[in-house]
């Protein structure tokens, strides 16, 4: 996986991105039906698949590019909004940073110690990929031990 080769991140940057994500970000963790064409015949097959992604959207291109350069995962997309705002002027261009699946796990593990508002969804993604509680016979996890483990994972 590409994120395993990343250098360790500055703790201040991780805390800043966590705050930015709490305020401006969105996280999707759901299972739903998708149409896929991965066969030689005609038509599609329906599959029940997970949708796991996270994104930050704003009109400040510099901040979005900094997030992308700092995390070294995901992609940046420019979105022009059509129509006019309430004042009758044009909407500003929106910039979006987005990542999904294992890259989202990597980012969630970085943000977990500092997240507040989106903490529950972040923990759902981490638990989806790393169900450490299932390794224990009684399904109980010591919260302090888990916090220490997750705080130390990606940092110096």
Locate each region found by the language model.
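Internal intein/HINT superfamily modules and their associated LAGLIDADG
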Residues: 1-156
């Amino acid at each position: 996986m590409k994120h395993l080769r990343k250098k360790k991140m500055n703790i201040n940057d991780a805390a800043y991105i966590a705050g930015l994500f709490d305020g401006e970000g969105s996280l999707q963790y759901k299972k739903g039906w998708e149409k896929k064409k991965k066969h030689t015949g005609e038509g599609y097959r329906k599959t029940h698949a997970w949708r796991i992604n996270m994104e930050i959207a704003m009109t400040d291109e510099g901040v979005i590019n900094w997030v992308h350069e700092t995390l070294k995962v995901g992609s940046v997309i420019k979105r022009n909004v059509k129509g006019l705002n309430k004042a009758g002027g044009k909407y500003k261009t929106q910039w979006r940073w987005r990542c999904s699946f294992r890259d989202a796990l990597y980012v969630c593990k970085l943000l977990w110690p500092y997240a507040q508002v989106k903490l529950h969804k972040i923990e759902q993604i981490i638990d989806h990929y790393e169900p450490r509680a299932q390794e224990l016979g009684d399904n109980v996890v010591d919260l302090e031990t888990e916090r220490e483990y997750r705080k130390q994972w990606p940092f110096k």
